[in-house]
Structures are given as C-alpha cells and as structure tokens.
Curated annotation (Swiss-Prot):
This is Envelope glycoprotein. InterPro entries: Ebola-like_HR1-HR2, GPC_FiloV, GPC_filovir-type_extra_dom. Belongs to the filoviruses glycoprotein family. It comes from Sudan ebolavirus (strain Boniface-76) (SEBOV). Residues 524-539 are annotated as: Fusion peptide. The mucin-like region seems to be involved in the cytotoxic function. This region is also involved in binding to human CLEC10A. The coiled coil regions play a role in oligomerization and fusion activity. Residues 415-430, 438-458 have a biased composition (Polar residues). Residues 672-676 are cytoplasmic. The chain crosses the membrane at residues 651-671. Residues 305-485 are annotated as: Mucin-like region. CDD domains: Ebola-like_HR1-HR2. Residues 313-351, 406-458 are annotated as: Disordered. Keywords: Clathrin-mediated endocytosis of virus by host, Cleavage on pair of basic residues, Coiled coil, Disulfide bond, Fusion of virus membrane with host endosomal membrane, Fusion of virus membrane with host membrane, Glycoprotein, Host cell membrane, Host membrane, Host-virus interaction, Inhibition of host innate immune response by virus, Inhibition of host tetherin by virus, Lipoprotein, Membrane, Palmitate, Secreted, Signal, Transmembrane, Transmembrane helix, Viral attachment to host cell, Viral attachment to host entry receptor, Viral envelope protein, Viral immunoevasion, Viral penetration into host cytoplasm, Virion, Virus endocytosis by host, Virus entry into host cell.
Length: 676
C-alpha cells in the first residue's frame, strides 16, 4: 500500500494532468488522419495529398485501389451493345488483381453461353471469386455461340469487376460489371509519440442499410454470341420473347413486360412467340440512376395506341413428328397525335394504361423511382411508325388489331384451331389477342377535375410467369462489396452533393440595405432648425438618427455582400478541389499504366513535376474569418417605426428629471408657506 501511495498524485494535479492527456489524444485523433481511409464501404478522404513527382512509391502502404465502373463514362450498357465490347482469344492467360473500394453498379451482367456441341464457352469462377454484389439491374443472358477462343476478354482493355477482384476474363454464371482500377496515393502517416489507432481493414459488407436498393434481374436469350451478327431476345416467359434491335433501357423492358402480360399477349402453346418493335418506337424510356454526367430528363409521350399484330408463322417438323413453331408479331403505334414533355426525376414507378372500357392502372412491380440507365444497341428493323410507352407514371392508350376476333371466337369458328390429341402439336397457332377499339379514348385523365369515376386497379395475373425478378438485400446470400455511389466514393474530395450552408437568419432578419443619402438642402434645414429654442435639440436628434439609419444600412449591405462572397468562395473552393482531385487521380492512373517504363517522370523528365498546390486551408480560413466578422454577429433591432415621435425619445429622461425638480421645488415652497 505504501508503494501504491507513492505513485498517487494530488487530486487537483491529477485532474490537470488527465485533462492535458485527453487534449493531446483528441488533437492527435483529429489531425493525424491520412488522405484516404477505407472504412466499411466508403472511401473517405479527409485531406488532399501533395503530388509526389517520383517514378516509384515510397511505400506500398500508400497505394489504395478503387474500382470505377465504365458506365460512369457514358458507355452503352444494354446487352447487344455490351456484348460487342467482348471478344474471345486464345493463348493469353487470365490476370486477376484485387481492389479495396468500388462504386455501386447500375448494370451488371451474368452469362451462361454454350458452344454448338453443348460444351461451355466460359470457364467457371475460381475459388474466392464472388459476384459483384451491388447491382441495380442484372442482365442474365443465356444462349449459344461459336466462342472462337479460350477466354472472353474486353476489347477495350478494361477489367471485369467482381467482389473486390478484377479479372481480365469473364467467368460463367457470376455477376460482373465493366470497369477499370484507379489508384490513390495516400499521405504517409507521421510518426508521433501518440500514434492514432490503425486504420481498420475494409469489411466485406455495408452497415448502412439505408443505402440498399433492390436488385432486379432481366433475362435474355442470345443466338450466335461472340459473332459479328447476333440476335438478342428479351425473355417474357419460356415461350414469349421480344426482339431487341434498338437502344433501350431497363425501364422500357419492365414496362413492356407489364404491358404484354396485362393484355395477355403471350404464347399459349409450346411454340415461340417473338414480338418485334416498329422502327420509330421510343425504347429510350426512363431516367438515369445517379450519373450526373448523363441526362436526367427524358421525353414523355402521351396518348399512344399500341397494336399487337401477327405477321408470320413458321413450322418445321423434325424426325419425331413434332413441330417447332415460331410465330412473329409486331407491336406498332396507331396514335394520331403525340405529345412530348419533360418528366421530373422522381416519377412514380407505375405504368398507366387507358382502355375504352375505363381507366386501368397497372403497378410496375419491378421498377423503382429514379432509375436511369445508358442505352445503345444494334440497327433497327421493321417498317411501321410506332412509339411505345412513356416513362414511369405516364399514360398510354392500347388497342389491338389483326384478327378482329377474340381467341374464344377463333377457337369456336375455325376447325383447325380446335385442340385434339392428334392435331394439337401441328395446328396453326394464332396468338390470343383481345379485341379493343382503335378510337382515341375520351375518358378524362384520372387527376383532372372532370374525372368522376375512380380508376380500378389491375394487377398481373397470378398464373403468368415473368422473367423479371427482384431480390431484396435481406434475401441475398452473397456478401457485399466495399462499394458506394459516386458521391460516396469521392464525396469528401468535393464530388458529393453537399447541402448548402444555412444562412444566418440574424443577418437577414429586418436588415434594409437601401441607403438614403442626405442632400445639402436637408443638412441646411436641419442646421437652421437647430437654432430654434427648445426645438433645436430635437432637430439635431432627427438628423443624427438619419445618420444612424444610413450607418445600419451600410452594415447591412456589407453583411449581405460578405454572405454572397462567402458562398461564391465556397463554390470556387469546391470547383478547384474537384479539379485538383481529378488531376491527381489521372496522374496516378498514368503512372500506373507507364510503370513498366519507369513512370511518367522517367519519360517526361523535369516537366512532369508540376505540383497542384493545395490552398484549401488558406481559403477556408478566409471564409471563416468573413463569416465570423460579418455574418455571425447579431444585428441591432432594425424596426422601421419612424413617426413624429422619432427623435424626441432621447429627451424623455431629461424631461422627467426636470419635471421632478420643478415638482420638488413647488412642494418645498408649499411646505414652507404652511409652516410659516
């Protein structure tokens, strides 16, 4: 006990020492953070590192890798366009590199392609390779192709991004995104007495559940995959398809799927039914998800009438006396008028359909708000004018032509359509087409004042299978990638949409910046009135109060000018920070690409050492000083209550005092008179 008592400090000294130690620890934690910190799922940057003009890194610990998706550069993401960027080669071994942080992908792909002999075209994923887990749309394609090579590579030299692994080849049955690997060079941490805690290794999941969104699957069938001319079919169900021959978005495919299933334009036999789209049908429908460099508004087309028409029937009999039928149909437009408008970014996720019997509304079960996808595909075919659906939440009118009879009437009137055990597999097939008029509906819009009836709600029939699947985060079995949106990855570098600074209400409360300049005549009048007895001091007060109003107006104007200047400086600081950040990222990417030749400086020499200086702290200090001097200080009361009483209020205390003295003298005289 005696030994322990020797180590104890007095209470007051212990408090001072502990307070000093805590201050040092907090200061160390606040100011010793490196440039980039990979925590959980977001690459957060706390300071900008100075550009190092060297042909090699001082330490590999300074290098952090980030996976960036190609769709952020505006490449086409639909299946027909994406497959043209992939090709097969032989004799080149695959390469796999790891990365630590990445973006959320808008479009991912999943391929299962077979050769004509039934063998697999793509290799299975090696151990440890998991699918890219953060995809809004997964385009799952199956089919056949020649596959002239051992592996499928990217023709542009990009990577195929998986879960924290980037490979040069495509693996079978695994979700992947197209992208590149960029490298950030972080500041080397300083060695101090009290070291900050080590950076936590990036976890393979995202703790922030609010950043989740559902993953939707779209299924395709591809013929002649990997060749110059291939055919891509969007799968509605096992026997109903849509030929994709033009730019399209996932939102368009969702709406087309809902429309076909609502009107039961499905194959009711074992044969295939392939719908084609007219040349002028607008398949570029929907909004971009989060890429700010892409369009955020799209045309809205209202009042369309769609028609489903059977074109041809092909029958081929095989050795087993069974026939394989492929029926082709065309989706065309019979609208007489077209209206274009701009759609807000947050449109409701549903497709409204007008039919002659009344308004019906079909919820789009697999679409979410704010979807945006890049599009680009092959050449267009067919010949009739058409325009498909508007964007989410828009109305369209649908009518069908072709047979002129319902399916029940066709079956009852045509003996060839009557099913029998002997002829069921060889009968001529006509798709089931409901009869609707082609006249324009006169039903007022649902939200218009003239609408008197409530629109019934129709849902997709339960017995209809759909190729559009939605997987929610809690149902997913794969672990997450250290991913985030574009604003999450480089947010603190200046790329995130920051909320605007709240303007101090005290600075703009009742502040009037309008100045009143006193003229020479007003000054002479005030000076002349000042010589009048008993009235002069009041006139001087009026003149002085006018000067004070002018002074307050000057202060108010300066405060507003300081506020606007501060906002302009903040925008300028953000722009320069973004530009400097992009410069550093591009420089590091160039150094990585030229590393085999010694780096950029080895090639350019001294010209490469152009350092983009970081003046962030200097500008921030000036902004804070302006805010402290002009904006955060409270304003005096600026009530505009000028009246005849203004200017005389300062004489009230003096008048009260004089009146009190006079009353005291009178009272004293009265007392003396009474006593005498």
């Amino acid at each position: 006990m005696e030994g322990l008592s020797l180590l104890q400090l007095p209470r007051d000294k212990f408090r001072k020492s502990s307070f000093f130690v805590w201050v040092i620890i907090l200061f160390q934690k606040a100011f010793s953070m490196p440039l980039g910190v990979v925590t959980n799922s977001t690459l957060e940057v706390t300071e900008i590192d100075q550009l190092v003009c060297k042909d090699h890194l001082a330490s590999t610990d300074q290098l952090k890798s980030v996976g960036l998706n190609l769709e952020g550069s505006g490449v086409s993401t639909d299946i027909p366009s994406a497959t043209k960027r992939w090709g097969f080669r032989s004799g080149v071994p695959p390469q796999v590199v790891s990365y630590e942080a990445g973006e959320w992908a808008e479009n991912c792909y999943n391929l299962e392609i077979k050769k004509p002999d039934g063998s697999e075209c793509l290799p299975p994923p090696p151990d440890g390779v998991r699918g890219f887990p953060r995809c809004r749309y997964v385009h799952k394609a199956q089919g056949t192709g020649p596959c002239p090579g051992d592996y499928a590579f990217h023709k542009d030299g990009a990577f195929f991004l998986y879960d924290r692994l980037a490979s040069t080849v495509i693996y079978r049955g695994v979700n992947f995104a197209e992208g590149v690997i960029a490298f950030l060079i972080l500041a080397k941490p300083k060695e101090t007495f009290l070291q900050s805690p080590p950076i936590r290794e990036a976890a393979n999941y995202t703790e922030n559940t609010s950043s989740y969104y559902a993953t939707s699957y779209l299924e395709y069938e591809i013929e002649n995959f990997g060749a110059q001319h291939s055919t891509t079919l969007f799968k509605i169900n096992n026997n109903t398809f849509v030929l994709l021959d033009r730019p399209h978005t996932p939102q368009f495919l969702f709406q087309l799927n809902d429309t076909i299933q609502l009107h039961q334009q499905l194959s009711n036999t074992t044969g295939k039914l392939i719908w084609t789209l007219d040349a002028n049908i607008n398949a570029d429908i929907g909004e971009w998800a989060f890429w700010e460099n892409k369009k955020n508004l799209s045309e809205q087309l209202r009042g369309e009438e769609l028609s489903f028409e059977t074109l041809s029937l092909n029958e081929t009999e095989d050795d087993d006396a069974t026939s394989s039928r492929t029926t082709k149909g065309r989706i065309s437009d019979r609208a007489t008028r077209k209206y274009s408008d701009l759609v807000p970014k947050d449109s409701p996720g549903m497709v409204s359909l007008h039919v002659p019997e009344g308004e019906t509304t079909l919820p789009s079960q697999n679409s979410t708000e704010g979807r945006r996808v890049d599009v680009n595909t092959q050449e267009t075919i067919t010949e009739t004018t058409a325009t498909i659906i508007g964007t989410n939440g828009n109305n369209m009118q649908i009518s069908t032509i072709g047979t002129g009879l319902s399916s029940s009437q066709i079956l009852s009137s045509s003996p060839t359509m009557a099913p029998s055990p002997e002829t069921q597999t060889s009968t001529t097939y006509t798709p089931k087409l409901p009869v609707m008029t082609t006249e324009e509906s006169t039903t007022p819009p649902r939200n218009s004042p003239g609408s008197t009836t409530e629109a019934p709600t129709l849902t997709t029939p339960e017995n209809i299978t759909t190729a559009v699947k939605t997987v929610w985060p809690q149902e997913s079995t794969s672990n997450g990638l250290i991913t985030s949106t574009v604003t999450g990855i480089l947010g603190s570098l200046g790329l995130r949409k920051r909320s605007r600074r709240q303007v101090n209400t005290r600075a703009t409360g009742k502040c009037n910046p309008n100045l009143h300049y006193w003229t020479a005549q007003e000054q002479h009048n005030a000076a002349g009135i000042a010589w009048i007895p008993y009235f002069g001091p009041g006139a001087e007060g009026i003149y002085t109060e006018g000067l004070m109003h002018n002074q307050n107006a000057l202060v108010c104007g300066l405060r507003q000018l300081a506020n606007e200047t501060t906002q302009a400086l903040q925008l300028f600081l953000r722009a320069t920070t973004e530009l400097r950040t992009y410069t550093i990222l591009n420089r590091k990417a160039i150094d990585f690409l030229l590393r085999r030749w010694g780096g950029t400086c080895r090639i350019l020499g001294p010209d490469c050492c152009i350092e983009p200086h970081d003046w962030t702290k200097n500008i921030t200090d000036k902004i804070n000083q302006i805010i402290h001097d002009f904006i955060d200080n409270p304003l005096p009361n600026q009530d505009n209550d000028d009246n005849w009483w203004t200017g005389w209020r300062q004489w009230i205390p003096a008048g009260i005092g004089i009146t009190g003295i006079i009353i005291a003298i009178i009272a004293l005289l009265c007392v003396c008179k009474l006593l005498c």
